[in-house]
Amino acid sequence: MKNSIFKNKYNSTQYNLNSSVDIVLVGAGIMSVTLGSFLTILEPSWIIHIYERLNKPAQESSNSWNNAGTGHAAFCELNYTKYNKINDSIDITKALSINTAFELSLQFWAFLTKNGIINNPKSFINNIPHISFVWGQKNINFLKKRFQTLQTHNLFHGMIYSEDPHQIKSWIPLVMTGRNNNQKVAATYMPMGTDINFEEITTQLLAQLKKNPNFNIYLEHDVTHIERHNNKYWKISVQDIQHKKTIHTYTKYVFIGAGGKSLNLLQTANIQSVSGYAGFPVGGQFLVTYNPEIVSQHQAKVYGKANVSMPPMSVPHIDTRILNNKKVLLFGPFATFSSKFLKYGSWLDLFHSLNKHNLKPIIQAGIDNFPLIKYLFNQLIMSNHDRINALKEYYPEVNSKDWFLIQAGQRVQIIKKNNKNRGILQFGTEIVSSADGSLSALLGASPGASISVSITIKLLNIMFQNKYYNDLWKTKLIEIVPSYINPTLNNYHSDFMKQIRKNTRNILKLIYIEKENRSLIFKK
């Protein structure tokens, strides 16, 4: 076997690429770097490789401009709470699941901050109130019932509900100024909401990982093929873009955290569990303003309610973002379509993913999701005037001259067979693994980055079953993520968990509210 030894500008040491390593991580985004950070703590002697096809880490979905930066905790995202017509109730199961998963991320980041692994939490996470805002009596009734149901759980204590326009205007003056006085509105206000710069977290974690002599990251290295080798190792074929040659690495474990490209790479591995899976690529655009007079009037992430039968991605929101210590406002998203599976991918990505196993599921999912097809068509034909009119519902006094359009990231939604063997479109994220778990990938989209630690813990259990329950890993995991041992919903009512939540937020310099707030503020 011919060796290829060279020094990459992002590496601290020379390394023999045609060799055996403990784990290969594909993609240098928030997911791979989070898993790599856990493994460096749990198994510091393990040799870890990250391969990234671009010339810089965190430039796809983790890039600060390619996502909305919402710390998804189900405070304001109405699509995480469904109305049940049968018994006139609100199902908060998914909201609780998302919130508890986000708590794990906060605990991990607090551990990293406390131990000096990452610095200055204000550089990557800040309190920005999360607000749900609706109009129309039906939506107001829904929001009120949602608030009352969420208040039965202490994870949502601190939230305030109001139908008083004056109170709401004090929270979001930009949204309320110039609005029709006869329009009935309602809002919930959660001061514990956050804005997160996932690119900054990724960059800081990588800087720490590079200090480990057993860790190497190779930029401009495109993983093109994965196959089983001697029933023991995975053979990874990597295209060295800069030197225009292919090298091979043999590894015991593989995690594919390559965003939209994860599906294509899983298909090359020829594992049974990916049969029938397909991807539906959807891009996003946002209107942006830097105008300080406008930005100063808005200090919140305001989420509305999607129209009936519309997909979750259609939920409009106007957000404060803090990027490089500078505030900007974003409004959107506006959907785009491209056959690329990555923002910097190939137009052939979608076509390369098609095969005899997933063509039928794709067609079936398309037939069953006509509202999505209609939504995308309407989005694609939108003019800038149409987009400004959409923004006007959340900023009545908008001036189009203050806003410009940016292209955000590319997401690939999951299409797979259900228990009736029919193709369905699935929103969210999912781990797909080989039979023994040694090869695993993350498919899907939101709320991925916000719950990256919860996903990582699931990966540890799937990929390293022989180590996950041993005493050494247990001890370390409890130190890293204190609620790991028993992260059940009921446990969050305990004094122990309340103290963990309080300590976590103190370390991250975030607001913590323990007291329940059942007060409803109505229009006088």
UniProtKB/Swiss-Prot annotation:
Gene Ontology terms describing biological process = tricarboxylic acid cycle
Superkingdom classification of source: Bacteria
MF terms from GO for this chain are: 2-hydroxyglutarate dehydrogenase activity; L-malate dehydrogenase (quinone) activity
Q: In which pathway does it act?
A: Carbohydrate metabolism; tricarboxylic acid cycle; oxaloacetate from (S)-malate (quinone route): step 1/1
Top class in the EC scheme:
oxidoreductase
Q: Which reaction does it catalyse?
A: (S)-malate + a quinone = a quinol + oxaloacetate
Q: Name one Pfam family in it.
A: Mqo
The protein's required cofactor(s) are namely:
FAD
Please provide the record's keywords in A-Z order: FAD, Flavoprotein, Oxidoreductase, Tricarboxylic acid cycle
Protein family according to the UniProt entry: Belongs to the MQO family.
* Listed name of the protein: Probable malate:quinone oxidoreductase
In its UniProt entry, the species of origin is given as: Blochmanniella floridana
